[in-house]
Amino acid sequence: MVGLDPHSAPAVLKAENKLTKDSGTTVDEFVKWQVVSSNGRTYHFSSASGKIWERSAAGTWTLVHTTVAGAGEHKCLGAIEFRGYIVWATESRLHRILATDAEGSSEWTANKVLNWQTFTKTNKYWHPMVEQNLNLYIGDGNQLAEWDGTTFTASALDIKVPLVIKCLGKIGTDVIIGTYIDDSITKTEVFRWNTWSVSFTTSDTIEEVGVNAFIPADNLVYVSAGLSGNIYAYDGQNLDLYKKVQGEYSSTATAIVHPDAVSNFGGQVLFGVSNVSGNPCLQGVYRMGRNSRNYPWIMDLAYPISERNTGAFVISSIEVGSIVTLGQKILVSWKNSTTYGVDLLDTAKLDGAYFETRVMRPDRMAFSMFTDFSIAYNSLPTSTAVTLSYDKNYTGSYTTPTTPQVVDVDRKVISLEEGIEATALQLKAVFTCVTTTTPSIEMLQVSLT
């Protein structure tokens, strides 16, 4: 499924709300860290330079500051709000500004405190941050720095070299640490630390090229690890392979989840899948969710980014940098080649959302005649539609039927009569939406003769 909502109304399927570009032309670099501030604004940090953009509560975007660090590179490698301060990291330095003094570019110019603290290891790739037990923890190479609101400690915990801290999360009252060594090393570890012992509490080793991100859920943590779409469930001690983002992975076809491209939205888990090489899978904002405990968990590509290519979704050769929840909406930063942006979840529905069936093979050794196709719906607003196409015998592309679909408004059924002789058949159903209205369907039935 791409862009569909199987959760809000049980037993029916309809289009999701769409992502719409909110940043205009203001954001001109890839954002990998975002902060939702207590001052009612959001801040967006460039991964390519020291640029920091502000989004006001009214949705106005402004470049408020460009960081120039006292040493090392200027691009942002981590950011958070902690105890009323907006804190961000560059390679060698930590910087801050009071959120109440950070409204607009003039306040940033007057009140920012650059080079507030200095890192020991000066890692040039990641300085992830997490708040736990009233303290702020920041990754720096193989060390974990700590700020308790008064004292900054550059090395509150160290782990063994050559492991590098790539992402941070929390479980219970503990901090969890995700690590990475090198793209050629298929082994890494997750550490759990109680924040006060001289060493970590537990660790678990997995055969993956790094831990990419911790994905927060209700009373548990999911973990993105490696370059092949693997999602693990973490119980505080052990990692257990839970799901896999569907795709065809190899040494030249890999994907990743960036450390801040995760969020929890209305009880549903979101994570952004980015291409590394070869486009092994569809890319965008995936969701793991369910309506209630009585329903199974479903993983789907819920939110394609706002970019389009002649009307089609852009779900390859992109990156999702960061996802944050903003009330009842989300902000999603992305990169598409040399185009960048931050999307906001819209009230309009996603025109073109679709699902593909499993391949149907009634008798794989003989041809079958597929004759009648019926879609039962409970709502089909004016000018909306659900349109079928088919792929027979693994051609890899979908064909438009030669006969028209017929809508029976009394039975609320969309019918298609088209004789398709095939050993294997797959269907695609595309939703046509109009502003905030979407079809809502209950089932798809296929008949054979």
Model-derived features with residue positions:
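N-terminal beta-propeller domains
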Residues: 1-70, 75-114, 125-126, 133-156, ...
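A short, polar beta-strand/turn micro-motif
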Residues: 152, 157, 198, 237-239, ...
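Exposed aromatic-hydrophobic patches
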Residues: 156, 202, 316-320, 409-419
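Non-cytosolic beta-sandwich-type ligand-binding/adhesion modules
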Residues: 55-57, 90-91, 97-102, 295-300, ...
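Conserved loop/turn at the beginning of each blade in beta-propeller domains
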Residues: 26-29, 71-73, 120-123, 129, ...
